[in-house]
Amino acid sequence: DPKKNLIGFAMDQVFATAQEPIRYGHITSETLIPPSRGLGSSSTAIVGGLLLANALVKHPLSKEELLVIANRMEGHPDNVAPAIYGNLCCATGLKNKVLNTVISIPPELHFAVVVPEVMVSTEYARSVLPNHIPFKEAVQNVSHASLFVTSLITHQLSNLSVALDDNLHVPYRKTLIPHCDEVFEAAKVAGAYGATISGSGSTLIAYVDKAHVQEVAKAMGAVFTANEIENKIYCLEADTTGALII
């Protein structure tokens, strides 16, 4: 039943939008993305289903049309837009469309990622957020978000040490991740521009240049290891193409 899983349901949406009959078959799904870690596992399933179905229809949908479907399914474009387009996406969903701007990630920027064996469901991570925040903090977050984007465009990566400072979700969600502040500090000491929570957590991500990425990743993982928390570390680069059929 395609309605019982995200991949099948996403495929069903493409067939309906393309006004073509549903194709039935057996799908084997393998993923390296663990659930409940703030890494966009649901978006991965949605976009994977969309691309698979789009490869089967006679008149494939555009990326813009796929993004509208993905946004409707996910409820926001935050993860599905970059999954479809690659790079950094600044997007907002409207009633029947998504406004999306793609910004190239500087090739010299790498990412040190640590995934601890700590599950944080998206629903629970949302529940710890306050209903209201001080106006001053909201203004500061807008300022930092703007600085973040412009720093990537201008390759002024040292600005990320300030731009990654967040008031909206990190102060609240870090309470769900043991030793979060220690990991952030270890990343900076090892050479990162800054670090933050990936999505709703528990994954933590540091922004760093290529020369220091391995050292930073090891330092982040070492904090969890020292506190007897299993973890995996990754040294990553930004994807610049988006999801592909291979």
Residue locations for each model-derived region?
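A short glycine/serine-rich beta->alpha loop
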Residues: 1, 31-40, 68-77, 131-136
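ATP-binding N-lobe of GHMP and related small-molecule kinases
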Residues: 1-37, 51, 59-61, 239-241, ...
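Short, well-ordered amphipathic alpha-helical segments that serve as non-catalytic structural scaffolds
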Residues: 6-15, 145, 183, 219-220
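Phosphate-handling active-site elements
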Residues: 16-25, 53-69, 96-99, 213-219
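DPxDG-like acidic metal-binding loop motif
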Residues: 39-63, 84-86
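Alpha/beta catalytic cores of group-transfer enzymes, especially the acyltransferase/condensing modules
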Residues: 61-109, 175, 195
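Acyltransferase
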Residues: 109-185, 189
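Glycine-rich, charge-dense phosphate/pyrophosphate-binding loop(s)
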Residues: 152-246
